[in-house]
């Protein structure tokens, strides 16, 4: 156990210590302990509510982005998803706020930059963050009443959980089907092969924990009464852990908590510490799962090996295990990467790989996907661990030093959402009786580690391997992709549905029809929202933040508090330089620079040096749009950051990867990279299918959208898939891949049109970096590759005979988009289009697509820079109905919507949540550098947004939406008899 002997190192921390003396009583709360943490510039205060036993953790820090959360321990009793469905229904109305979904309604009555509710494996929590004190008080009140006093109506359970309902609600002769937001959400989740693997792994090794999100096969067993019982048992102050962070007075929160908890007593809880399987001998579990259509048949298996390694309550041992996991599996020089991935045994690490502290035990897992022979995989892993024990110095000391350096740097790197990240790191352990102060004692753990490393060296890790892994029982888990799996899920659902329907009598069926009609009527009701607290437009400052930037030649500098760190960004404008046929190779080129190696060094050697001396080096390619014209700006970017004293290393590494990356010598590494990219294609679509659909639709309108589709969309996935098919033909691979990347290197690496952005904490440091930039540019070619190529603005749009495309994926649900043409960033109509998109989302599409249609999410968005108006739906069981809703939105606004000034103001509040969201120091001024959007442009747009009227909304609805068909894209399974030519183009991947 680490000792909590700390001393305040600053005036602010000393003040906090005096403000909250140990033993002090504040509104029924007693201060139990206080902990200054100077290295994080914070003071932690641990309090307990005397009447109920509720625990509160306050993090006092000079940060205006304040955070509140209330969390409950919620062990799932089964896999019906009751914790998850309760999380949803809790936010569907409460005693004080008896409106449908006050949580969603508060999204446009607030300036919160984050609002959410989340279900963990054995806990549920409700966090938000905002910079506005009144907003903080408003949301805190809504969150507390929603969680402690929810209405939990039957119709909310039906809507958010699951229900039997006619496919066509108004037609009693139409088929009865399963509906429900969570039901469809989880159907979408199991379409993601990575999620399915992780979920089944957790259920196999930790069956007592059940599936808190819900297994669709089990969700339909949940009854309304079970939901009420689960809330009564778990959503009680005695089971609550509340959290605050920031610079607002703690006493205001304690006062409100005490008032909310006043009607409750102390309730004894005997939560059983849920344990995993009893791993006394080796266990091997094999299952079938989703096939990945982008991988060959022999690469359809995911497999992992897991060992139980002590308990997370031993925080130091857990820290050592995490370092060991990092040494084993993180980066190109890690032994598991070299022996498992580079060797070709697998394509990439599986989603469960690494060290995971669970409820009661730590799990260390080594897993890969795309494995052809599981026995070879197991033998290789076992041999690696055995060799690590038999080698005198198995780990390069530089790698360990690099890990320490990364930990130190991460502590100094200031993030805008620091409070939320702190909550996420503390809460899982805190709900399982791990002292939250232990999680904050970063420096103490690091000092102990340094000392042990000096005295014990590598035996520190060898002892862990000997204690927990070698000759210890192992849990092996694998899932083989099956072409029949998707059909088996459909068949199971139909069988389950038939069983439910068979059990119904005629009266039950009449009740189902009536209930569907009543639910729709409820959803259509105009509600009185006056009970909800709200901010006003006057709470939004008319003038936005401006960042002072100094420009000298090709370099911009921003001086701000960076905590001793310097961030450097470089970019080269590639317009009119690259031949169109090389555009698809650009993302692979950027990835290759930080994966392959040079003529003289492997990337594993380079990577270790990067981690030892910097916070990281990255390269990327992106396309933005000119704010005045929407013309494309194709950019190659390269970034790096380090301590002020080490910025010379950034330029050293940039020079190395830009000038010396050798595609020919490292072609084997290039093949590994292509395999890795191909293996993650399908899961990336399952995670963000609506974004892929939106991008594909937008690519029909502007060259910037078409380029973005080539670089980041479905077309890029197809391209990587094609390259993957060339790997076994060496001659073709050299010609079609290696030679093309080498050619790109000549086009890209040149100082022409190259610019830089420095973020640091002093003019002296900025001048030092400017000098380093000059020396760096002297090493690069100049003028060898000028804009003499095809005009980037002429890049071809996606040509299609019809305006509807189905892109087939083996999912259980769909993702949809419909796109229409908008205007450039500086055009005044852009602000009205953005406000209209928000009003459609909150006042129309949420009800139609989610509440009625059963999709997990849906709405409208406007990309101000790209000038594209988009509709979308996410995990949608009724994609064609959603598309019809999108198509009729213009008519709805002009004929049916009864929007008033309040609706307009709420839309503006929602928009400014992101416009005025806090930025980290490294993000200040970067929009101007990357996109050319000046402070004056942002201010003009800000004023336009604030001044948008209802007449403006109606005008742009008529001009840009009414009678406009748009371009539609659906991603997911085929829809029998509906998505056929000539009206639809169907793409098979």
Swiss-Prot record:
Database matches in Pfam families: M16C_assoc, Peptidase_M16, Peptidase_M16_C, PreP_C
Keyword line: Hydrolase, Metal-binding, Metalloprotease, Mitochondrion, Phosphoprotein, Protease, Transit peptide, Zinc
EC number annotated for this UniProt entry: 3.4.24.-
GO CC annotations on file: mitochondrial intermembrane space; mitochondrial matrix; mitochondrion
Residue positions binding Zn(2+): 84, 88, 185
Phosphoserine: residues carrying this PTM: 920
Activity: how regulated: Activated by nucleotides, including ATP, GTP, CTP, UTP, and ADP. Activated by copper, manganese, calcium and magnesium ions; copper and manganese restore activity following inactivation by EDTA (ethylenediaminetetraacetic acid). Inhibited by metal chelators including EDTA, EGTA (ethylene glycol bis(2-aminoethyl)tetraacetic acid), and 1,10-phenanthroline. Inhibited by copper, zinc, and iron ions. Also inhibited by dithiothreitol p-mercuribenzenesulfonic acid, N-ethylmaleimide, protoporphyrin, hemin, protamine and triarginine.
GO molecular function: ATP-dependent peptidase activity; metalloendopeptidase activity; zinc ion binding
GO biological process terms on file: mitochondrial protein processing; protein processing; proteolysis involved in protein catabolic process
InterPro entries: Metalloenz_LuxS/M16, Pept_M16_N, Peptidase_M16_C, Peptidase_M16C_assoc, PreP_C
Chief location category: mitochondrion
Binding positions (ATP): 972-979
Protein name, UniProt field: Presequence protease, mitochondrial
Organism in which the protein naturally occurs: Saccharomyces cerevisiae (strain ATCC 204508 / S288c)
Higher taxonomy: Eukaryota, Fungi, Dikarya, Ascomycota, Saccharomycotina
């Amino acid at each position: 156990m680490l000792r909590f002997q700390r001393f305040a190192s600053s005036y602010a921390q000393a003040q906090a210590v005096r403000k909250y003396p140990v033993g002090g009583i504040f509104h029924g709360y007693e201060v139990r302990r206080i902990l200054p943490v100077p290295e994080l510039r914070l003071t932690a205060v641990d309090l307990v509510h005397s009447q109920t036993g509720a625990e509160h953790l306050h993090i006092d820090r000079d940060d205006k982005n304040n955070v509140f959360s209330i969390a409950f321990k919620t062990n799932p009793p089964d896999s019906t998803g009751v914790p998850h469905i309760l999380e949803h229904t809790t936010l569907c109305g409460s005693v004080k706020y008896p409106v449908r979904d006050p949580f969603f309604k508060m999204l446009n009555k607030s300036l919160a930059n984050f609002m959410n509710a989340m279900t963990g494996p054995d806990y549920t929590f409700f966090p938000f963050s905002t910079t506005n004190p009144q907003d903080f008080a408003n949301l805190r009140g809504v969150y507390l009443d929603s969680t402690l006093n929810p209405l939990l109506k039957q119709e909310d359970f039906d809507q958010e959980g699951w229900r039997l309902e006619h496919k066509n609600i108004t037609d009693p002769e139409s088929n009865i089907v399963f509906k429900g937001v969570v039901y469809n959400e989880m159907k979408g989740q199991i379409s993601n092969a990575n999620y399915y693997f992780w979920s089944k792994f957790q259920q196999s090794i930790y069956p007592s924990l059940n599936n808190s999100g819900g297994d669709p096969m089990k969700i339909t067993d949940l009854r309304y009464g079970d939901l009420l019982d689960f809330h009564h048992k778990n959503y009680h102050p005695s089971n609550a852990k509340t959290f605050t962070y920031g610079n607002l007075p703690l006493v205001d929160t304690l006062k409100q908590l005490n008032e909310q908890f006043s009607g409750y007593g102390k309730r004894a809880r005997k939560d059983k510490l849920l344990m995993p399987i009893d791993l006394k001998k080796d266990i091997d579990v094999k299952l079938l799962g989703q096939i990945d259509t982008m991988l060959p048949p022999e690469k359809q298996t995911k497999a992992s090996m897991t060992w139980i390694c002590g308990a997370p309550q031993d925080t130091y041992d857990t820290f050592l295990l995490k370092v060991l996991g990092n040494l084993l599996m993180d980066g190109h020089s890690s032994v598991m990467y070299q022996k498992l991935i580079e060797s070709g045994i697998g394509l990439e690490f599986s989603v469960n790989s690494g060290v995971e502290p669970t409820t009661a035990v730590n799990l260390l897992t080594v897993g890969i996907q795309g494995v052809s022979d599981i026995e070879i995989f197991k033998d290789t892993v076992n041999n690696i661990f055995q060799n690590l024990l038999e080698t005198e110095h198995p780990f390069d000391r530089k790698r360990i030093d690099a890990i320490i350096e990364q930990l130190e740097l991460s502590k100094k790197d200031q993030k805008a959402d620091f409070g939320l990240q702190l909550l996420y790191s503390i809460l899982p352990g805190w709900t399982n009786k791990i002292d939250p102060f232990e999680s904050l004692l970063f420096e103490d753990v690091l000092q102990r580690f340094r000392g042990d490393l000096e005295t014990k060296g590598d035996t520190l890790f060898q002892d862990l391997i000997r204690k927990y892994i070698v000759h210890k029982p192992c849990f092996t888990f694998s899932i083989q992709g099956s072409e029949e799996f998707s059909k088996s899920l459909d068949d199971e659902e139909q069988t389950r549905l038939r069983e439910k329907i068979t059990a119904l009598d005629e009266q039950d069926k009449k009740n189902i029809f009536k209930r569907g009609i009543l639910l729709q009527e409820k959803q259509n009701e105009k509600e009185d929202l006056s009970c909800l607290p709200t901010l006003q437009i006057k709470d939004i400052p008319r003038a936005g933040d401006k960042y002072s930037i100094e420009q000298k030649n090709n370099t911009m500098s921003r001086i701000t508090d960076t905590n001793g760190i310097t961030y450097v960004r470089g970019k080269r404008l590639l317009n009119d330089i690259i031949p169109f046929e090389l555009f698809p190779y650009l993302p692979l080129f950027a990835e290759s620079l930080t994966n392959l190696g040079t003529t003289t060094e492997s990337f594993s050697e380079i990577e270790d040096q990067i981690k030892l001396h910097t916070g990281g080096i990255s390269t990327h390619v992106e396309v933005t749009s000119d704010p005045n014209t929407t013309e494309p700006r194709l950019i190659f970017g390269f970034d790096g950051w380090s301590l002020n004293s080490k910025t010379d290393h950034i330029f050293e590494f940039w020079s190395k990867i830009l000038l010396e990356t050798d595609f020919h010598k490292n072609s084997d590494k290039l093949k590994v990279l292509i395999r890795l990219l191909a293996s993650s294609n399908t899961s990336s679509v399952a995670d963000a299918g609506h974004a892929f659909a939106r991008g594909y639709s937008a690519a029909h309108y502007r060259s910037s959208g078409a380029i973005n589709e080539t670089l980041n969309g479905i077309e890029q996935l197809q391209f990587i898939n094609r390259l993957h098919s060339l790997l076994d033909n060496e001659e073709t691979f050299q010609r079609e891949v290696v030679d093309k990347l080498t050619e790109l290197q000549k086009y890209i690496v040149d100082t022409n049109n190259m610019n830089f952005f420095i973020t640091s904490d002093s003019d002296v440091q900025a001048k030092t970096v400017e000098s380093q930039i000059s020396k760096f540019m002297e090493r690069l070619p100049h003028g060898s590759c000028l804009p003499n190529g095809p005009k980037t603005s002429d890049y071809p749009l996606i040509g299609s005979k019809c305006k509807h495309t189905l892109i087939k994926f083996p999912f259980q649900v769909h993702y949809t988009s419909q796109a229409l043409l908008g205007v450039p960033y500086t055009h005044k109509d852009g602000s009205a289009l953005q406000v209209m998109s928000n009003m459609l989302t909150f006042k129309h599409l949420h009800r139609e697509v989610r509440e009625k249609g059963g999709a997990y999410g849906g709405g409208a968005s406007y990309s101000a820079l790209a000038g594209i108006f988009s509709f979308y739906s996410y995990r949608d069981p009724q994609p064609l109905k959603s598309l019809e809703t999108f198509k009729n939105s213009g008519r709805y606004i002009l004929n049916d919507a009864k929007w008033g000034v309040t609706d307009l103001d709420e839309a503006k509040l929602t928009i400014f949540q992101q416009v005025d969201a806090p930025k980290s120091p490294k993000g200040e001024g970067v929009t101007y550098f990357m996109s050319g959007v000046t402070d004056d442009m942002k201010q003009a747009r800000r004023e336009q947004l604030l001044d948008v009227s209802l007449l403006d909304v109606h005008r742009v609805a008529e001009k840009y939406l009414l009678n406009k068909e748009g371009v539609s894209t659906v991603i997911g399974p085929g829809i029998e008899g509906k998505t056929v030519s000539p009206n639809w183009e169907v793409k098979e991947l």
